């Protein structure tokens, strides 16, 4: 049995003082749970509290919600996975109807107003039995931000941008002539005096309040010269309305102008919210109450003063990309927005019903006024179509956790991938310990999709925090404090490498530290804080990469992304070299079952575990058996306990997908060699041994779901039956008497899974007398139904593991039933599959060699995988070499290693010394001197499997942890003989799902021209593409064996071009010039 050795620190005697600081990693999904808890206990109540009182047209009746009297019903435990149900809680609120004048209560009822989706134990939402997750959005925080920019003349101007809680913006700017404007659109601006007057101030109040009244006096003089009067609030509102909405002509003030400005301008651009008010007060040194959420005139006056100071060099500009100016919109904020929208819709619905009922003089009651549709429909729309509500990535357990910890700058109120510039995407110094600088998407979303650092947390204000150790002269008084991005700038923070220093040497050592956006080397006495963990700066995915510090950041990014694409294998194996976080990821994923208290195992089998708790109650825990994930991988739990055994709280009961004995296991430890082999590993191609196939090393299970609906049509209901005419019995052999496939059957491509007949009208030719005569003569049976069976698609063969029949939904007109058929496939690794390591070293399987032909070690062990040595130097991911060599030593020593990255903090070349020392131990213990050869450390001589000769040069050989990715050739391979054509161009469609063709573009044509294959090129551009007549002629020629005729007419794409030109009134014509006409004079032509 192998033992796990942790090599994350030197012997304890060197820094025994650190034993005082025992800490554990935070729960990796707590951002989801904490935020939803805040929504239920805070935001839900606050939204119900602001629901207004509603009156009828005569102001006689009053309807109101008693906000303190509400309850959420605990949902029943049902198998929602298969029945299109949503895991939600019914919300009941007490409503009251009373007479307004006398305040007499007419009726009081507790009414069901809708359902609120609940978060489950895996921090996900089940909507229509589909697992979804709400990802967090990072946005610019509401408040005021000062910046300098260039105007259209290239002159530098200073601006102050006020961002409202709704996302609207009001920009104040001071130009080169020291005039202050309020910009209301890209092309329109008004004087700041107009805005202040429209907000209710008088000219005297404005002049008395600002520090530089000369600016406003100059503006008033300019208005007098133009004979424009601007003395009152009404005049200013008219002026503002003209600039915003009015087209032309004279305009007089009216109350409708005030209401429209209030609704469309002030509410959208001047409502700061709680966080905006906090930021404005802090920036402008104001003491306005925190419950004043709207922008006040004194806010504008203070903002103007600060803008003038910046103009004259006093004050500081803001960095808009700093994390102190950005906040997280988590589950609570997004759901609160939807609840607010639903209650507005409910308010409008109640008002309409109330007015309609009183107008018809019918009896009013709270139950008749309330409808559940607004709340249910709003949440359904949000979870179904909102860009931040996404299908949970369930490829493996790591993919689930990373998806739940994702941060997105996209979505409503955020940036777009086309307009986002480099500054928004770039790494910012304030991301340190809060947002991972490595893990992000590749392509258009680079820098816009990020991941939380492993210790980062979101506070109640929506700002990212990170923990630090506070340094004290007395070591026992040191403690952990959480700081947000703006707070840590005032401290000198030592980086993670100082943790390994001895307490006695720290006082005289120069330590690298971070202070005010710079990295310094200062004495230890000047340090205020220090990091708590070397991996504190990185996300979960990056933290699982061993020897991370030896990799280029781009390859670490690819490695972290590809770990999320690893397919769970049938035979699991722990990595020999890891970082120690594998168990934390496995436990926090929610895919393993753990004991909630001290319990005794009474019974266990493959489907359930029976537990006896402290109160002598037997609790049956049912396991997840061969369940399909969102990514068509297999979720399967196996018990890891035996009967009659006592367990403590928190112990693991089961394994899950890609989880073995409580640790994340994404791949396999296999023997790799870095060497070229007859060109088969050219350009990242990979050569593998047949052992990986025959011993099911990389075999995985994939479950596909096929769906068919049975509806009521105009001709009658569709019928599920086994009796399908015109189909052979061989394709119907797996159907039962009801027309459904029998679970456990092995089905091949083309086999019928569900037999279905759709009614249709009989053709007119068969209803005529001559048609009936032909039926009688030839015995033709007239069928009035069309076969629309569900069949196994191409590459869909496998074992049917389940058939689910979902009954008719309520309140649905033409919906009858849905049938789901689940087919499991066991896929072995094959040519075309993608494999990768944890260091961004990826490749495609190019050839599978027999074991006897593979290069082999000096003890006769054949190599499992041959990688290209040219894939290491240029990519600069040397961590894979350290991993495979240490893995080889661990394999022969029977050890597993858990290594914290950045071990060079202990001494120079620490990783190299560790690897070589372990290889030396392995060679001594096993007697295999080739494991460590002093002249070629880390390399050994290999023998050619075909000839038995020793290769000329020593080869790097080791045990690497390689992953099989979800990009598999079975899902991608595609061929087309015939298929659908586009209606306009008559060319084959595009894409595998449409049975499309391969595009031959401009460069492909050049390549074929270069090889001189004229006939192949002509066929590709005409017969195989869009020449309609030639297609039919070629088919006939092939059948009869005649030579393929040459096309005599133009292809359809040329005819399409002619039609397009005709639509532009251009006509193409052609003329033949004979030899006798060549002497025609030029002027005649």
UniProtKB/Swiss-Prot annotation:
It comes from Physcomitrium patens (Spreading-leaved earth moss). GO terms for molecular function: DNA binding; DNA-directed RNA polymerase activity; ribonucleoside binding. Keywords: Chloroplast, DNA-directed RNA polymerase, Nucleotidyltransferase, Plastid, Transcription, Transferase. The keyword Plastid applies. It catalyses: RNA(n) + a ribonucleoside 5'-triphosphate = RNA(n+1) + diphosphate. In plastids the minimal PEP RNA polymerase catalytic core is composed of four subunits: alpha, beta, beta', and beta''. When a (nuclear-encoded) sigma factor is associated with the core the holoenzyme is formed, which can initiate transcription. One of its GO terms (cellular component) is mitochondrion. It comes from the Eukaryota. Its main location: plastid. It is found in: Plastid, Chloroplast. Coiled coil: none annotated. Pfam families: RNA_pol_Rpb2_2, RNA_pol_Rpb2_3, RNA_pol_Rpb2_6, RNA_pol_Rpb2_7. This is DNA-directed RNA polymerase subunit beta. Belongs to the RNA polymerase beta chain family. The keyword Cell inner membrane does not apply. The lineage of its organism: Eukaryota, Viridiplantae, Streptophyta, Embryophyta, Bryophyta. Its EC number is 2.7.7.6. GO terms for biological process: DNA-templated transcription.
